[in-house]
Amino acid sequence: MKETFIHPTALVEQGVELGQGVSVGPFCHIQSGAVIGDNSELMSHVVVTGATTLGTGGKVYPHAVLGCDPQNNKHKGGPTKLNIGANCLIREGVTMHKGSDSARGYTSVGDNCSFLAYAHVAHDCDIGDYVTFSNNVMIGGHTTIGHHAILGGGAAIHQFVRVGHHAFVGGMAAVVSDLIPYGMAIGVHAHLGGLNIVGMKRSGMERKEIHNLRHAVRMLFDRTKPIRDRAKDVLTAIPDSPAVIDMIDFINVDTKRAYCTPPLDAVHGGAGHDSGED
């Protein structure tokens, strides 16, 4: 394993925990209490506060700022955290805030995530594994992003919104409602534009499951009954599909948000346009 390297111009305060093989580049500032995992690299001009844990194998590009106070007037300055998983790529100018003491108290990022330039993660968010934030993505506080979700450039996610796993948010979309697993949100404000077929195929999902999900979405969003009643009908019609069960479990969680739905004209013809062909 390579030796840990700290550039002479970097400021690493007493009380920082550096793993083996860490590289800290010019003009970085790592504050007391921070934990930097093995083989992580901070290129230059990176700020890591003492509230932050960065997992093994992370790579952080210039001018990223990790673990500063939440932009939340309810936060009173109590001890809170930012936890970032292993093998995360954090590009130039990315900002991630720690949790707030008026809520759960920590912001969490999973493993193998990519945050492209100037993306922002707000306080108390929960981000899964293998998530991609394209340039200038912004997510509000208390947002949940599921595993393998992809957020296109400039997308904005409202606070408390849930984005399901394997979902896709189009570039410049403004999402103010929960987005179902495997769903594709497009537009301002974003609507459900179909299913993320490309993402499902990339994940190795079988053709039968993709067809099950298409059938489920058509039933869920036909607007003839309340959505919870439609969810029961879906499980009756498609009882043995793990992907459909995931989607219905997502629908059945009580939250403060509505759901991304297809435009009215799309509902009459199905459930919008899928992001790919089957």
Swiss-Prot record:
Function: Involved in the biosynthesis of lipid A, a phosphorylated glycolipid that anchors the lipopolysaccharide to the outer membrane of the cell.
UniProt keyword annotations, A-Z: Acyltransferase, Cytoplasm, Lipid A biosynthesis, Lipid biosynthesis, Lipid metabolism, Repeat, Transferase
Gene3D superfamilies with a match to the protein in the record: Hexapeptide repeat proteins, Udp N-acetylglucosamine O-acyltransferase, C-terminal domain
Enzyme class, UniProt record, top EC level: transferase
Family in the record: Belongs to the transferase hexapeptide repeat family. LpxA subfamily.
Full protein name: Acyl-[acyl-carrier-protein]--UDP-N-acetylglucosamine O-acyltransferase
Pathway annotation from the record: Glycolipid biosynthesis; lipid IV(A) biosynthesis; lipid IV(A) from (3R)-3-hydroxytetradecanoyl-[acyl-carrier-protein] and UDP-N-acetyl-alpha-D-glucosamine: step 1/6
Subunit field text: Homotrimer.
Reaction catalyzed: a (3R)-hydroxyacyl-[ACP] + UDP-N-acetyl-alpha-D-glucosamine = a UDP-3-O-[(3R)-3-hydroxyacyl]-N-acetyl-alpha-D-glucosamine + holo-[ACP]
Organism from which the protein derives: Brucella anthropi (strain ATCC 49188 / DSM 6882 / CCUG 24695 / JCM 21032 / LMG 3331 / NBRC 15819 / NCTC 12168 / Alc 37)
Name of a matching Pfam family: Hexapep
InterPro entries: Acetyltransf_C, Acetyltransf_C_sf, Hexapep, Hexapep_transf_CS, Lipid_A_LpxA, Trimer_LpxA-like_sf
